[in-house]
Amino acid sequence: MPEAEMKEEAPEAHFTVDKQNISLWPREPPPKQDLSPVLRKPLCICVAFTCLALVLVTSIVLQAVFYPRLMGKILDVKSDAQMLKGRVDNISTLGSDLKTERGRVDDAEVQMQIVNTTLKRVRSQILSLETSMKIANDQLQILTMSWGEVDSLSAKIPELKRDLDKASALNTKVQGLQNSLENVNKLLKQQSDILEMVARGWKYFSGNFYYFSRTPKTWYSAEQFCISRKAHLTSVSSESEQKFLYKAADGIPHWIGLTKAGSEGDWYWVDQTSFNKEQSRRFWIPGEPNNAGNNEHCANIRVSALKCWNDGPCDNTFLFICKRPYVQTTE
């Protein structure tokens, strides 16, 4: 390569390394070829020291000017950082407190809902109580009015009691008259029934009707005739009845309802009246019943006397007496 080209490509700046510091400055114009190498070297050193001194002075000046400001800024930054840290701590504390307060607010909302529900229930109860109170007041007014009426009636009680006593006495009299009227009506009805039966040929005695036949029949035929008239051959249950019968028979034999079953049987009344054997002893003709010929199983009234009963064959034909109890009918 030609020397001229190498000169053109030579570096146009110089630098030195001093304890890790690098200094760079522009290349001085190429020394004249007439300077000796010994003179060029000290000159370069002086320039380098001069530049270095300028750099140091500039650095010191800059530090003197900007260091206080920089330190102030650093202190401000530290202060701001400390303040921010305090605020962050405060914010963390506030966040925790906020969470606590939020929980309290939630609890308060729940309590508020409970209170609102309770308040609604209380209001409903108050309305119900007001309604009940109104009803009670209305009833109280009615009771007050009724009490006034009671007071008014209380003053009339003595008079009403006297009227009630009079009415009770009058009612007793009316009841007595009504009972008497009913008895009279019963007697009239009884008299009417008796007259009707008498008109049909019956006789009345002590609550019974008696029919004295005009046609003689056997004992069995006579009983069938009585049954057709809702009666039976007569029974005798007292001495007064015995006297009535034999007097009405007037000494003419009449069949009565006393019979027995066979020669060894007991006497009985066909109308189911209980037969009093001891009492009947006073009504038999002396020596009767004798069951003459072992065929006398039916009794008749034979004579006009208290002792008028006689036993005879049931196939004999006699007049007869039917007996029918009087039963009052209601219309």
UniProtKB/Swiss-Prot annotation:
In this protein, the residues bearing a glycan are: N90, N116
Molecular function terms, GO-annotated: carbohydrate binding
Q: Which residues lie on this side of the membrane: Extracellular?
A: 63-331
Q: How does it sit in the membrane?
A: Single-pass type II membrane protein
One Gene Ontology cellular component term attached to this UniProt record is: plasma membrane
Q: Tissue specificity, please?
A: Expressed by Langerhans cells. Expressed in dendritic cells and by scattered cells in lymph nodes and spleen. Also detected in some non-lymphoid tissues such as lung, liver and heart.
Q: Which GO terms describe its biological process?
A: defense response to virus
> What's the name of the protein?
C-type lectin domain family 4 member K
